Amino acid sequence: MSGLDGVKRTTPLQTHSIIISDQVPSDQDAHQYLRLRDQSEATQVMAEPGEGGSETVALPPPPPSEEGGVPQDAAGRGGTPQIRVVGGRGHVAIKAGQEEGQPPAEGLAAASVVMAADRSLKKGVQGGEKALEICGAQRSASELTAGAEAEAEEVKTGKCATVSAAVAERESAEVVKEGLAEKEVMEEQMEVEEQPPEGEEIEVAEEDRLEEEAREEEGPWPLHEALRMDPLEAIQLELDTVNAQADRAFQQLEHKFGRMRRHYLERRNYIIQNIPGFWMTAFRNHPQLSAMIRGQDAEMLRYITNLEVKELRHPRTGCKFKFFFRRNPYFRNKLIVKEYEVRSSGRVVSLSTPIIWRRGHEPQSFIRRNQDLICSFFTWFSDHSLPESDKIAEIIKEDLWPNPLQYYLLREGVRRARRRPLREPVEIPRPFGFQSG
């Protein structure tokens, strides 16, 4: 029977243990003890390590006791002692009985080796557990230390924030106090500056008294006059505003109704052109214009075919008179224009078309009557310096041109009975202006 026949397989374990007998080795043979220890180490190395398993190696049986009995194994079951080897895939039992020639001292030495190994393993396990306990304690201590440090840091941060807020409040309070102190100092300085010396106080009081006496002597008239002038100026400003609004509204109405009138004026002109001597009769029947028409002027007015009065681009800037003539023996012009323009300064400037007179028919510039110089009608076209020039233009524009029919029918009314009376024109009181035509 070979040594391997006694191999005994057991269930795999997580740890390996060494089973030894209860025999205590003696010091009989130190050499045998060392040899047995070397064999045990070699057997341990040769055993293949397994996955959590253990191998049991049987040691040589101890020698019989002195009483002649059979020695018992460690478990009390008898038989061969075994060594469980760490790292094996199974339990290998090597019976010591296979080696017949081994002395009893070898069993004692092997037992001592196994006991020493068991003690070292137990010490190792206990040392490992103690090391783990020490490591855990150190780890817990480090964690506690870190937590305490974090709490201390938070407390420190909170204290710093509180201290910073307190410092800021203290600084702001100091700034406010400094500002109040400076303000008080400035007020005291101003009070000191405002308080004049005693001599100056007397002079100021004397000046105030003199001023009051002067006011009493003047009386309440300036005050009442100022109270009256202020409302008067306010009323005048309001009146100017209303007048400006009225002027704008009047100009808008003039443009509007001027366009509406234009159609009727064109039809009227067409009819008047077919009435011989219409404008000459109207001029001669007018009570103011008739004084300027004498002799040759009346003959020349017989050739007037039409008259137009037109305003310039802006109603208040001026107007234009157009006289249309047919061929006549007195002058060559078929159209004579007289224009009045109001400048920005308010001055009225007149311009006219030069009359081309035929030879020997130049009119007399003035007619002497009752020691007065009276402007001739045709002189009105060429002479712009006489005051009567503007008066003629205003009469034609404001009176004759709006309704020439009433002056034409004056002479006709003398010769025939009129069916209805003429309606007197309504004069609108306004400054020198021009109607649309």
From Swiss-Prot:
* MF terms (GO), sorted A to Z: chromatin binding; enzyme binding; histone binding
Q: Where in the cell is it found?
A: Nucleus, Nucleolus
The associated disease is: Sudden infant death with dysgenesis of the testes syndrome: Autosomal recessive disorder. Affected infants appear normal at birth, develop signs of visceroautonomic dysfunction early in life, and die before 12 months of age of abrupt cardiorespiratory arrest. Features included bradycardia, hypothermia, severe gastroesophageal reflux, laryngospasm, bronchospasm, and abnormal cardiorespiratory patterns during sleep.
Which residue stretches belong to region Disordered? 1-81
How is the protein altered post-translationally, as described in the entry? Ubiquitinated by the CRL2(APPBP2) complex, which recognizes the Arg-Xaa-Xaa-Gly sequence at the C-terminus, leading to its degradation.
Q: Where is this cross-link: Glycyl lysine isopeptide (Lys-Gly) (interchain with G-Cter in SUMO2)?
A: 156
Q: Pfam families given for it?
A: NAP
Query: What UniProt keywords are attached to this protein's entry?
Result: Isopeptide bond, Nucleus, Ubl conjugation
Record-linked PANTHER family: TESTIS-SPECIFIC Y-ENCODED PROTEIN
The annotated regions of Polar residues compositional bias extend over 11-26
Q: Origin organism of this chain? A: Homo sapiens (Human)
What GO terms fall under cellular component here?
chromatin; nucleolus; nucleoplasm; nucleus
> Which stretches are tagged as biased composition: Basic and acidic residues?
28-40
Q: Under what name is this protein listed? A: Testis-specific Y-encoded-like protein 1
